[in-house]
């Protein structure tokens, strides 16, 4: 007898279904994405669907896809909330290794839900890079999608800001910027816009690694498209063209990354006086009147640093790419930082 369908899944379609999100009578989650790519997730892990493959174009074997078993994980306390679900720490019962377990509950077959699931599962299947949080496996159980992620033991940039009231050195800011923009360069080469770069989605660990997380609202451009119109992400970090609902592209992430690095430097949101007033903030960003007043900052920054941030916050037409930002002179200061020393600094408590 097929397993009983949880009440939360009653809105989802049973196969066959021509698009979107569906489940089979054996409780397999089916996500049909753009271009006809189909991704299937079972209770035991990701299963290959028609047209699915790894980044290199070769299907992944069951041994690779199912190397972590759900039953071997002990799920613990909550780490935080992502764009589409909550994240808890999980520990492997046999090895003791820690993971971050993201779980997403379902509320029906909407375009946003399909896009979110496709983005999350695409990361599990294909997005592998030194500056992107790794995804190891996914499970569909009891009406939830569980995704096993790399555990970043120093937390987010928000956590680092809280732990270091003395502030970040400019060398450390350059180091974080270099790693963040390397990750963005990789994603953009995959035709992917992250769309939610902010301090909460840039993570660190004791190895000194900086990685981008949370792909719940990421958008992959296809079919020769270089722009999109869809509105997803966190409003305070959106670029002017996104606030104005204009077509936007990869360098919208550059604006968000610039604000993220500036927030690490200032220990507060760069346009802090406007943040509680969302309408006024949107107006200021859209009109170009939201500016950083460098003279009001207690900490004095180099001309290099100020230029770097201002380049990120240029209008869309003249805003550089991630590759161009990596050639900026500020990035050279990152070589002054030893990754292991960075990891020790990042893990230090107040």
UniProtKB/Swiss-Prot annotation:
It comes from the Eukaryota. Residues 73-331 form the Protein kinase domain. It is found in: Cytoplasm, Cytosol; Cell projection, Cilium, Flagellum; Nucleus. Its EC number is 2.7.12.2. Its cofactor is Mg(2+). One of its GO terms (biological process) is protein phosphorylation. PROSITE patterns: PROTEIN_KINASE_DOM, PROTEIN_KINASE_ST. InterPro entries: Kinase-like_dom_sf (IPR011009), Prot_kinase_dom (IPR000719). It catalyses: L-tyrosyl-[protein] + ATP = O-phospho-L-tyrosyl-[protein] + ADP + H(+); L-seryl-[protein] + ATP = O-phospho-L-seryl-[protein] + ADP + H(+); L-threonyl-[protein] + ATP = O-phospho-L-threonyl-[protein] + ADP + H(+). Pfam families: Pkinase (PF00069). Can use both Mg(2+) and Mn(2+) in vitro and shows higher activity with Mn(2+) but Mg(2+) is likely to be the in vivo cofactor. ATP binds at residues 79-87, 102. Protein kinase which regulates promastigote proliferation in host macrophages, thereby playing an essential role in parasite virulence. This is Putative mitogen-activated protein kinase kinase 4. It comes from Leishmania mexicana. The gene is MKK4.
